Regions:
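Beta-propeller blade termini and top-face loops
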Residues: 1-179
Length: 179
């Protein structure tokens, strides 16, 4: 009864509806809205797939299905060209849990998620965050978390200046310190 009363007295009479996607694990790792295309959003799930909507969430479609990995840690849209997406695989452990899906590195799409190219960094296992340069979509920083429960020397911050053709680790503390 209290819930109904509070709902009715909400400013602007906001009404929430379930818009999906609904066939997933419910562990959202990343959500990005396209700054250049109103109504276009991407949602990445920790244990399965990347979904896209172009109509403010009324309809969703999976756009990362045929890849050799399930876990996703982050997605980034290039600010200077929103058709360019970077996807970091491997759940990021932003939430406290005992099981996470490992990944296979970083992927790039130049067509809004229709097709994907694998860019390497397979040994990083879990990508926590991706940042794309505001004016040059080929300059990207990736926070690699490595293996969570065993030794891992692939942790650190990686940078590419050529769209993922080559990666350089620009920060590494030790095998116990995740990015």
């Amino acid at each position: 009864e209290e819930y109904k009363k509070a709902k009715e007295n909400t400013p602007f009479q906001v009404k929430w509806i379930s818009a999906g996607p609904v066939t997933n694990s419910a562990r959202v790792e990343a959500l990005q809205g396209d700054p250049n295309q109103p109504g276009t959003m991407y949602v990445a799930f920790g244990s399965g797939n990347l979904w896209k909507t172009t109509n403010n969430g009324l309809d969703w479609k999976p756009i990362f299905e045929n890849q050799p990995t399930l876990g996703i840690g982050d997605i980034a849209i290039a600010p200077s060209n929103s058709e360019i997406l970077y996807l970091g695989t491997g759940e990021s452990l932003r939430k406290n849990r005992n099981f996470t899906m490992p990944g296979t590195g970083v992927y790039r799409s130049d067509d809004g998620g229709e097709t994907w190219a694998h860019l390497g960094l397979e040994e990083t296992w879990h990508i926590g965050e991706i940042v794309v340069h505001p004016h040059n979509p080929d300059i990207v920083f990736v926070a690699a978390m490595g293996k969570f429960w065993s030794e891992s020397t692939s942790k650190g911050i990686y940078r590419t200046i050529n769209g993922g053709k080559d990666w350089e680790r620009v920060l590494y503390v030790n095998e116990d310190t995740r990015a």
